């Protein structure tokens, strides 16, 4: 039997609060109502509840720490309550009233189809301006030959004689705490509650076939990278006339060669010449809406950042926008001609670029302070 601490993903020194917190997280993750049609998740959910039934109780945990797995094979004592009772005590609030016994499924009840997840890559500009995109994906649909029954037309599926149509096998053991009953999926019908003797040739008894579906979705302005859009009812078809699942589209935004997005602001480096920085100049700044003129002030220093307000990314479902923040980078030419060189020398001499006395003193004082 698997270590109960490992099942709840905690160490043996974990506090009761840590055990409870981990149990809530795992139970929420693997709950059958979230993982509709996923038998592996359902079995994991049962396993988690079984582990918490022991470790969530101080006295039972103490005996488990003492006897380990042997506690399930011997002795008598106080009885176990149904795992679902523990779950129902506090998960109703989290899940809005999920049934505490929903894992004990009725195999003939309608089952919602499972959800589908796809990724959609879009251009940077499309994430800013919004767009419409076509998505093509594969989904499970009801078999058109057997109408989702799984049995060959003209035949019927029959009730499983091992589980009597419940899809569940009860395994009862005596423990130091009394009788312990654990439910598991019937291995004969695989939890379906029925057996198909003559399977539909088209779907091989599965009741569904794979179909490629194409739909159009609208990408809103300002959508974020990694955002998940849900399209209700476009997932896999349900079983026993259950409703279909949903389609979840994960948005992936391609990087832009020039712009970078930080929240709803656009940032980038803007190259300017030495003369533009010194003299000031009207420069053309690229924006999401086209070219914007900007008055660069005289004496602009390298790496100064300027802002174009409300020229950034639109906020979702809002008319407001972020800003554009561009940082000026002074480009130094690698080569200049003779005339340019002579003029630059004259300019340098006229500026007398030697540091004045006050500037020198200020620098020396700061260096001196570093070593005191």
UniProtKB/Swiss-Prot annotation:
Domain J spans what residues? 3-68
By its UniProt entry, which SMART domains does this protein fall under? DnaJ
Q: How is the cofactor bound?
A: Binds 2 Zn(2+) ions per monomer.
Note whether Zinc occurs among the keywords.
Answer: yes
**Family annotation (Pfam families):** DnaJ (PF00226), DnaJ_C (PF01556), DnaJ_CXXCXGXG (PF00684)
Provide a GO CC annotation, any one. Answer: cytoplasm
- Primary location class: cytoplasm
Keyword annotations from UniProtKB, A to Z? Chaperone, Cytoplasm, DNA replication, Metal-binding, Repeat, Stress response, Zinc, Zinc-finger
CR-type zinc-finger residues:
130-212
Self-association state and partner proteins as the record states: Homodimer.
Q: HAMAP family recorded for this chain? A: DnaJ
- Entry's free-text remark on domains: The J domain is necessary and sufficient to stimulate DnaK ATPase activity. Zinc center 1 plays an important role in the autonomous, DnaK-independent chaperone activity of DnaJ. Zinc center 2 is essential for interaction with DnaK and for DnaJ activity.
Q: Name it.
A: Chaperone protein DnaJ
